Amino acid sequence: HRDYEIVLEGGSSSWGKVKARAKVNVPPASPLLPADCNVKLNVKPLDPAKGFVRISAVFESIVDSTKNKLTIEADIANETKERRISVGEGMVSVGGFSHSFSFEGSVVNMFYYRSDAVRRNVPNPIYRQGRQFHDILMKVPLDNNDLIDTWEGTVRAIGSTGTFNDWIRDFWFIGPAFTALNEGGQRISRIEVNGLNTESGPKGPVGVSRWRFSHGGSGMVDSISRWAELFPFDKLNRPAQVEAGFRSDSQGIEVKVDGEFPGVSVDAGGGLRRILNHPLIPLVHHGMVGKFNNFNVDAQLKVVLPKGYKVRYAAPQYRSQNLEEYRWSGGAYARWVEHVCKGGVGQFEVLYAQ
């Protein structure tokens, strides 16, 4: 069952509040491992003209009764048009162990292919990462004995666990890579782990892992870029924040998200504004796991427009209206939700004006 709510600000403001409550009755990615995870993220403008922001984040998780926490505060600014620089510090704790660290680095903005439906929503996006995680080749230098032992232990454990491949083969990853693979003309097949092995390099052994994904691949990258769309730096004239909680157990996954974002709507020309996307989309695009055909969704959406505004066009069509409050449920909306959950691009087109 899912409830979503979007409350929009008036005038030409792109800001809005987003609330999502979802209970997904599918086995989580780690079927036997109950997990709790809480995320708090604050983004504060320091000099919007230079894209200069301060990000504070706290990630807490409890997995198998062990509490893990990661705290980060970082200042990020544009160094050049192509490069952003980041300086920050943080602390990681696992159970009774904690470790403080600081970091400094730069990132080059990279671009990856997006479908026309997404491109229509976002005129000038900056994308992160490659197009999709398909046939990843990951090299990790193993430069001390502890790392080598850990790596070899992992390889042995995976190689000797009969159930590992069984449960992975038995589930479909439901996410946007379904579409990405179709667009790329690739056949959709089940997940295969091609192999994990160790090869020698000039400075000692190098861990190499080659994975082939079917449709779980691009979920996380796509999700991150979708969340990033909600944080356009040029509209960040006050602090933005998001608080989220994820609970998973053998019954499924429960999600709670509350956020105030600067990029909930965009100017669509002619006095119209477009709601950028449905809260379902970034959640689903983490790549959900479930039996592909056995998937039904009970979802509803509430959109609250600024006073005096009206919806001028809606696809899927809304079910009811009371002044500035519009509600979607069942019918075309339910079919649209199921389409998105099964990896469809799922264009969500809601235009509003005074």
Curated annotation (Swiss-Prot):
Homotrimer. Each subunit contains 7 molecules of bacteriochlorophyll a. Bacteriochlorophyll a 1 binds at H99. Keywords: Bacteriochlorophyll, Chlorophyll, Chromophore, Electron transport, Magnesium, Metal-binding, Photosynthesis, Reaction center, Transport. Intermediary in the transfer of excitation energy from the chlorophyll to the reaction centers. The keyword Electron transport applies. Bacteriochlorophyll a 7 binds at H285. GO terms for biological process: photosynthesis. InterPro entries: BChl_A, Chl_A_sf. This is Bacteriochlorophyll a protein. Bacteriochlorophyll a 6 binds at H134. Gene3D superfamilies: Bacteriochlorophyll A. Bacteriochlorophyll a 3 binds at H286. Bacteriochlorophyll a 4 binds at H278. GO terms for molecular function: bacteriochlorophyll binding; metal ion binding.
